[in-house]
């Protein structure tokens, strides 16, 4: 047992020794391998460092060479730029030298001129003194000869100069007015002639009577009735006078209201056709005729509105418009006149680029007040403007109605066009006529207005009152004053007279020289 233990211990010791020897041998081999590897690594590192060192030296040399080339190039460019600047400075110095020489020469010339101007100014001052002395001597001599002071002579010269300037100014104004008038007349004639060519209207004559044809003369007695009951009833209900005379188979209806006269005519024709004529039947027929008349008036208004393209008129305004069919002004039917004015205003508005439909509407309604002027207090212009405002018409239409006779200032081009179309429609030949009494009174007023001015010798109304010729006294009225006189007469006629169309005023100045040979 002990032996086994000893053997085990000996074996352990031997094993440990062998293990140590083997481990030491391996350790030595590892150390030698590491030394060899380290030597190899050091050698490789030395070689690589030498290679990197050489490459770095080469790169440094290349960079140095490149930098040196760039520096040399920049230096070369700087030298060239400096050389160029030096050349420019040399040229500028040369230019400045030349300018300096020129300025020196100019200064010398200016000094020389200054000396000459000084001498000339001195000479001028001396001559001015001489002239002033001569003028004073002449003034003294003139005052002695003319027995006038300097202020009196100055006043005479100023007055003469003022008269001469006024004369020239009047001539210039006259020439300017003539040129403007000729140009405006030419343009207006072209525009109005175009409008007239595109518009045609009927002419009618004013009448205050209507004639009803009878089938026979026996019907006259039936119309009169027993003790005149029928004729009195008809006259009372219609307000129209029935004239029954010796005219065969005819009865005359007389009255100044065309609507009532038309109702009476319609009633009488119905009674004649029916054959039953008595007061009750007359009342029935008058009422029926009035209803038919209201319908006809509405149709006339609608037809007029349709003809000019006014499609949105108020129904009440259409009825009032239709009443114009039975109104006349100086013999011209007012509804036809309104339609004509609407068409003319539309043509003029189209030529000037204005609203054609609005111009037609304003032209159609411009005399709407005449339908009610005998029922409502006020002028037809005021009534028409109030009606247009009441029925919410456009402000341009209201102003056109209010301003077409010049009572209110026109605020739009359409208002002016409506006034022009109204004057054109009224003034065309044959459009209007007037009674003999009014005609004679107008001629007398024309002559009286012309004769009221100082310097007028006589005046004559000619061309049916469309022209007044004024003869002036040549010793009191000069040619230039006659121009002012004709304007004054025209203004007074416009302010004092009411007339259709326009009136031409002609002032005639005549100077006669008479002598006798013996």
Curated annotation (Swiss-Prot):
Family annotation (Pfam families):
HD, KH_1, RNase_Y_N
Q: Name one GO molecular function term.
A: RNA binding
Family membership: Belongs to the RNase Y family.
Write down what this protein is called: Ribonuclease Y
Q: Name one GO cellular component term.
A: plasma membrane
Q: What does this protein do?
A: Endoribonuclease that initiates mRNA decay.
Q: Where is the HD domain?
A: 334-427
EC numbers listed for it are: 3.1.-.-
The record places domain KH at 208-268
Residue span of region Disordered: 91-119
Compartments in which it is found: Cell membrane
Superkingdom field: Bacteria
* PROSITE patterns found in the cross-reference section: HD (PS51831), KH_TYPE_1 (PS50084)
Task: Using the record, list the residue span of the signal peptide; answer none if the entry has no such feature.
Answer: none
Q: How does it sit in the membrane?
A: Single-pass membrane protein
GO annotation terms (biological process): mRNA catabolic process
- Which residue ranges run through the membrane? 2-22
Q: Which UniProt keywords apply?
A: Cell membrane, Endonuclease, Hydrolase, Membrane, Nuclease, RNA-binding, Transmembrane, Transmembrane helix
């Amino acid at each position: 047992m002990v032996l086994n233990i000893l053997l085990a211990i000996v074996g352990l010791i031997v094993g440990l020794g062998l293990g140590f020897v083997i481990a030491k041998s391996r350790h030595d081999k590892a150390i030698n391998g590491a030394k060899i590897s380290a030597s190899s690594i050091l050698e490789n590192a030395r070689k690589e460092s030498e290679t990197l060192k050489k490459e770095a030296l080469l790169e440094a040399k290349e960079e140095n060479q490149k930098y040196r080339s760039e520096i040399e190039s920049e230096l070369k460019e700087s030298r060239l730029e400096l050389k160029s600047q030096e050349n420019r400075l040399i040229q500028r110095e040369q230019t400045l030298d030349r300018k300096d020489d020129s300025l020196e020469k100019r200064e010398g010339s200016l000094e020389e001129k200054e000396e000459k101007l000084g001498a000339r100014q001195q000479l001028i001052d001396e001559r001015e003194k001489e002239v002033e002395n001569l003028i004073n001597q002449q003034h003294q001599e003139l005052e002695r000869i003319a027995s006038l002071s300097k202020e009196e002579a100055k006043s005479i010269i100023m007055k003469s100069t003022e008269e001469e300037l006024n004369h020239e100014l009047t001539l210039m104004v006259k020439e300017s007015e003539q040129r403007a008038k000729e140009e405006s007349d030419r343009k207006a004639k072209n525009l109005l002639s175009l409008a007239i060519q595109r518009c045609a209207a009927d002419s009618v004559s004013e009448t205050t009577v209507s004639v009803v044809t009878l089938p026979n003369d026996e019907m006259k007695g039936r119309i009169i009735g027993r003790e005149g009951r029928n004729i009195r009833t008809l006259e009372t209900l219609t307000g129209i006078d029935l004239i029954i005379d010796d005219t065969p188979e005819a009865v005359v209806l007389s009255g100044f209201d065309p609507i009532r006269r038309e109702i009476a005519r319609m009633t009488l024709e119905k009674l004649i056709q029916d054959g039953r004529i008595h007061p009750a039947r007359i009342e029935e027929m008058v009422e029926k005729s009035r209803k038919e008349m209201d319908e006809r008036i509405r149709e006339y208004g609608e037809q007029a509105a349709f003809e000019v393209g006014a499609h949105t008129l108020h129904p009440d305004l259409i009825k009032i418009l239709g009443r114009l069919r039975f109104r006349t002004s100086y013999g011209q039917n007012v509804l036809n006149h309104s339609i004509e004015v609407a068409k003319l205003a539309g043509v003029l508005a189209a030529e000037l680029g204005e609203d054609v439909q609005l111009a037609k509407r304003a032209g159609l309604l411009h005399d709407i007040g005449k339908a009610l002027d005998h029922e409502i207090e006020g002028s037809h212009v005021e009534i028409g403007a109030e009606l247009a405002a009441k029925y919410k018409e456009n402000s341009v239409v209201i102003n056109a109605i209010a301003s077409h006779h010049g009572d209110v200032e026109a605020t739009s081009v359409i208002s002016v066009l409506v006034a022009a179309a109204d004057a054109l429609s009224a003034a065309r030949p044959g459009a209007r006529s007037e009674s003999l009494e009014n005609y004679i009174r107008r001629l007398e007023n024309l002559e009286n207005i012309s004769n009221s001015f100082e310097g007028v010798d006589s005046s004559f109304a000619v061309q049916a009152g469309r022209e007044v010729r004024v003869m002036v006294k040549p010793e009191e009225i000069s040619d230039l004053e006659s121009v002012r006189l004709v304007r004054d007469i025209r203004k007074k006629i416009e302010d004092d007279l009411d007339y259709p169309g326009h009136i031409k005023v002609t002032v005639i100045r005549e100077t006669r020289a008479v002598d006798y040979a013996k």
